């Protein structure tokens, strides 16, 4: 799951303990978000920043529910077509699990053969929520434990 650190960083999540992940406005990313269940782990990726990369691990605290920001006119994520009865967007609650000693950079991730087919690394991939296979998960955990 990707977030811009000035919106929500791994350190913000650590301080808060739990936060709402909202503002997903792409149907494919929304569907990935909706498929996540309480207790599942995810990699927290810092995007659109000087050092993009995987910064830590979070846990899904509660299954998806209608995203309230879609109904808030002052929100950057407001959707004029959404209503309380028909809100196509979802939010999810997340919890902090761990931060890595350093961000696992996009360049480092791209250099790993085991991650070559990872959705995040595919050309044109801009989704904020993407699946990670069990093999990819293990490869990234190994990188994080090496202190890269």
Where are these regions (language model features)?
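Compositionally biased, charged N-terminal/linker segments
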Residues: 1-38, 136-137, 144-148
């Amino acid at each position: 799951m990707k977030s811009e650190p000035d919106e929500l960083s791994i350190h913000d999540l650590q301080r808060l303990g739990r936060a709402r992940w909202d503002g997903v406005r792409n149907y494919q990313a929304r569907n990935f978000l909706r498929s996540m269940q309480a207790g599942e782990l995810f990699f927290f990726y810092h995007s659109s920043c000087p050092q993009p990369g995987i910064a830590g691990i979070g846990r899904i605290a509660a299954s998806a529910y209608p995203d309230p920001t879609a109904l808030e006119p002052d929100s950057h994520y407001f959707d004029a077509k959404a209503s309380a009865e028909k809100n196509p967007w979802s939010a999810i609650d997340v919890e902090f699990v761990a931060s890595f000693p350093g961000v696992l950079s996009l360049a480092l991730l791209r250099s790993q053969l085991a991650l070559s087919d990872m959705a995040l690394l595919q050309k044109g991939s801009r989704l904020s929520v993407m699946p990670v296979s069990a093999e990819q998960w293990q490869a990234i955990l190994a990188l994080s434990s090496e202190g890269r």
